[in-house]
Regions:
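Alpha-helical transmembrane segments of integral membrane proteins
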Residues: 2-4, 96-129, 145, 158, ...
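N-terminal signal-anchor/signal peptide hydrophobic helix marking the start
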Residues: 6-12, 16
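Hydrophobic alpha-helical segments of integral membrane proteins
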Residues: 9, 52, 62-78, 88, ...
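Residue-level signal for discrete positions within transmembrane alpha-helices
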Residues: 12, 95, 99, 135-142, ...
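Hydrophobic alpha-helical transmembrane segments of membrane transport/permease proteins
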Residues: 15-67, 156-194
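Hydrophobic alpha-helical membrane-insertion segments
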Residues: 16-21, 140-161, 263, 267
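An internal, D/E-rich "acidic patch" concept
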Residues: 59-115
Length: 336
């Protein structure tokens, strides 16, 4: 098992350096520079512009800039935002709990609906229920996040007035941050009104962000269950007189979840990329909205640091998924 973990962990190193290359060079393909953006419409004196480029090291050749950047990254220094002059890591850690809270709620939404829906579709194969679940899953998978988000806002916020449009909590509540997760912090402060406000603000973003993973998980669960339900040991269990519920719950589900666990790990990356659009639509003060604003400002350190930190997080989650996969399926960890 240790060898299996070490092998998976060693793959992170080249992936990490690949991410630094992408984060550094792709950003510089965007026209303009952050100094011009910082100056705004009033413009900036050419001499002052050249001096600021030198101060931020942007006057050096790109490869030299990358060498300086990677050296600082290896020391844990992601630089400072050109716009706010705050350390990138500090800004990221301040906003990250909001993104995690949204991503966790979206994943729970996807799991609690997607897995049961996939199981029911497999058990009721070729029935109206099966076709309905797969049809809805295909629709959810194909639906653009920005369109789905605007549609839900128009229906539930504008027309019906059931849910808030934007933000994490109503402006009339102030919660002292303890964990950074408003649902938890509002419970710790024993403020029920703040808790329900935070929960209501989560409803639409959770649905929008969780729809795509829900569709993928439902389809994968159905496919895995259908494959397992056709195995000989399942037919043997049924021949012994076990009820359909016991066959599915005790024998089929555990083996069917093996490929589903892998898909769940892959959906973590989908959640964080989807969070960029979702947070923008709902003005959710998280890392995704922060990165979108940094793109408009050409804030290189923020973009590089944010992309790198999110990439490391996704790699860490995928490593945990691989380890979990090896625990569930011993054949995987013994493969050379």
């Amino acid at each position: 098992m240790l060898r299996f973990i070490f092998t998976r962990f060693s793959l992170i190193i080249p992936t990490f350096f690949g991410m630094t290359l992408l984060a550094f060079f792709l950003i510089r393909l965007v026209p303009g520079d952050p100094i011009e953006t910082l100056a705004g419409e009033r413009g900036i004196d050419p001499i002052r512009h050249a001096q600021l480029l030198k101060d931020y090291g942007l006057d050096k050749p790109v490869l030299v800039q990358y060498g300086i950047y990677i050296g600082r990254v290896l020391q844990g220094d992601l630089g400072k935002s050109i716009i706010t002059q705050e350390p990138v890591l500090r800004e990221f850690l301040t906003l990250f709990p909001a993104t995690v809270e949204l991503a966790v709620c979206a994943m729970l939404f996807a799991l609690l609906i997607g897995i049961p829906a996939g199981i029911i579709a497999a058990v009721k194969r070729n029935s109206l229920m099966d076709h309905g679940v797969m049809g809805i899953s295909l629709t959810g998978y194909s639906m653009p996040i920005f369109w789905w988000g605007l549609l839900l806002i128009l229906l539930f916020s504008v027309q019906l007035g059931w849910t808030p449009v934007s933000g994490r909590i109503s402006v009339k509540y102030f919660i002292e941050p303890v964990t950074g997760f408003l649902l938890i912090d509002s419970l710790l402060s024993s403020d029920k009104g703040a808790f329900w406000s935070a929960a209501s603000h989560l409803i639409l973003p959770t649905i929008v962000l969780g729809t795509n993973p829900l569709a993928v998980i439902a389809r994968m669960t159905r496919s895995a269950m259908l494959e397992v339900l056709g195995e000989d040991y399942i037919r043997t269990a049924r021949a012994k007189g076990l009820s359909n519920l016991r066959v599915v719950a005790l024998h089929a589900l555990r083996n069917a979840l093996i490929p589903v666990v892998t898909v769940i790990g892959l959906q973590v990356g989908v959640l964080f990329t989807g969070a960029i659009l979702t947070e923008t639509i709902f003005s959710w003060p998280g890392v995704g909205k922060w990165l979108i604003e940094a793109i408009g400002r050409r804030d290189y350190p923020v973009l590089q640091g944010g992309i790198l930190l999110l990439g490391l997080l996704v790699m860490a989650v995928n490593l945990l998924v691989d380890i979990t996969y090896g625990i569930i399926n011993p054949r995987i960890r013994h493969q050379r």
